[in-house]
Amino acid sequence: MRIALTNDDGIQAPGLRAIYKALIEAGHTVDVVAPVTEQSAVGHAVTIAMPLRVKVFHENGFRGHGVYGTPTDCMKLGLSSLLEHKPELVVSGINAGANVGPDILYSGTVSAATEAAHMGYRAVALSYDSFRPEDISAHARHAAALLPHIEWAGLPERCVVNINYPAVPVESIKGVRVCPQTRAVWHDWYEHRTDPRGGSYWWLNGVIPPETVAPGTDRALLTEGYITVTPLRFDFTDSETLTRLASLEE
């Protein structure tokens, strides 16, 4: 299978390199278009006020296009202009840090997959539930083996399959669960700090309170040690509320 690979952690990130190697070893052809720099939590941002520049990375058996832009830029430019062949599947990841619940709105990883889906491609987002993953080569091999089992024929158009791996050894994973995303939200705060030169700055912190996470949702099952699989479609219409606002019509 021909696969286009991207991420939001950057083209040199360990997660991308791990899944690249695993997909190649599984017999797939992999074309990489990924950001040159760290782009975590940029959401679905698109560069419109400056040109996009591209750097080719070719080292130790790895080859890919590095884009000085966002993950969405990578997909828009890569799938329309850079890649000579259309992929059968787009994979975004493996991200350092889970993308569950409200993370999905902020995630450059999920946004890259979403952009690919909007362009008519089958797309998967892969994430690992640790911001400092060590060796995830075994998880990458597991993901490479899991991807061919997705039954795309039964899924609607522009659907993204969001897959998250727990931060446990592969042999300790309890299984795979298809589940909804949690509706719990981040409780954020900013730490006010002073730099060595006396300047003031702020640093974001946050937590999703465990008691707000409903059982059977992606965050809950991931914490329990399951691989979570959540199909996503980005229609933000609140259908239940449409009729309540009908009085606004003239």
From Swiss-Prot:
GO MF annotations in UniProt: 5'-nucleotidase activity; metal ion binding; nucleotide binding
Record: residues binding a divalent metal cation: D8, D9, S40, N95
Tagged with keyword ATP-binding: no
Cofactor: a divalent metal cation
InterPro entries named in the record: SurE, SurE-like_Pase/nucleotidase, SurE-like_sf
SUPFAM superfamilies: SurE-like (SSF64167)
Keyword Cell membrane in annotation: no
Compartment(s) where it occurs, according to its Swiss-Prot or TrEMBL record: Cytoplasm
Known EC number: 3.1.3.5
Binding note for cofactor: Binds 1 divalent metal cation per subunit.
Keywords: Cytoplasm, Hydrolase, Metal-binding, Nucleotide-binding
Membership in a protein family: Belongs to the SurE nucleotidase family.
Function (record text): Nucleotidase that shows phosphatase activity on nucleoside 5'-monophosphates.
This protein's name: 5'-nucleotidase SurE
Organism lineage string: Bacteria, Pseudomonadati, Thermodesulfobacteriota, Desulfovibrionia, Desulfovibrionales
